[in-house]
Amino acid sequence: MGKGAIPDDWEENLGMAGMHGTWTANMAITQCDLLLTVGARFDDRVTGSVANFAPKARIVHFDIDQVEINKIVHADLSVNGDLRWSLPAFRKQLEASPIPAVQTVTWRQELQEMKAGHPAGTRPSSEKGLSPQVVLEETAKKAGPEALVATDVGQHQMWAAQFYPVSQPHHFITSGGLGTMGYGLPAALGAQLGEPDKPVVLITGDGSIMMNCQEFATLHKYGIAVKTVVLRNNTLGMVHQWQGMFYKGHFAESDLTANPSIAGVARSMGVPAWTVEKEEDLPAALDRLFAQEGPALLEVTIPPDENVYPMVPGGKKLDEMVTGGDNA
């Protein structure tokens, strides 16, 4: 939820931690000897096995909500209060007693080596569909750094967190651990009304968008210029991934091949919409999407068997990541 508070392109930003976090972020938490935590609630999507979370570290927890402190993860030191005063006070203490650079240089080098050795994995497009990672990276380039991006819930949400770079606070809008399918379109609509002069992009999937697709009519009626990118894999992708990895491939009720064309649904409500099935057609389609005045939608076919990695299986330690393949 804090994505953008620290620019994604800052070299010392290790990326998101947790179940679908980066290899480097998860290993850094596992190996560090001091963990400063600002405003986190330590939900199970971040900690993995709570008993084995940050096993070598003393934990300092800053939070405005006293209830969150020591609720899940024990803090060796806690600071309860508004970050607007607690962080500046902490900084003054650091400036008064600075840590010698020699004590941190080796660790920082190790982290950069981790990042270089374990980059985020982008799979190539295939005859089954476009690479979702490429779609998100190209969408971000076309939308520009000022764009606000909202997501629904599922694989596309995790890919957006991993591959859609954000450099400003409050520019990545998602329901986070609440897991609310259908959240994305009304969230994007509200963001566009609140920031009428900025581009607003909705990243969604063909499962989530069906939860609230009637709001296309609202976009059309009021000319709300949300640009929607639908990653269509004809499955409830995250459910399908878990069924394949942990339930012996029993793909119960996760097949969406009977769903209508999302582009067709949008057009029926007055929103211009197109489809893309080949990577060579993507740049022109994105240009057309962002050139359109008012709302518009692009439906992109991605492979149905594309999984989100890394993945920490439920209850496992953060360093027990699955980094690829078809099963755990």
Give, region by region, the residue ranges found by the protein language model.
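Alpha-helix capping/helix-boundary segments
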Residues: 2, 42, 155-156, 235, ...
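Anionic group-transfer/hydrolysis microenvironments
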Residues: 39-41, 63-65, 154, 208, ...
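Glycine-rich, acidic loop regions that bind phosphate or pyrophosphate groups
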Residues: 2-108, 286, 290
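Active-site diphosphate/adenylate-binding microenvironment
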Residues: 110-191
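Structural beta-sheet core signal
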Residues: 37, 61, 151, 202, ...
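Short conserved AdoMet
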Residues: 54-55, 144, 195, 291
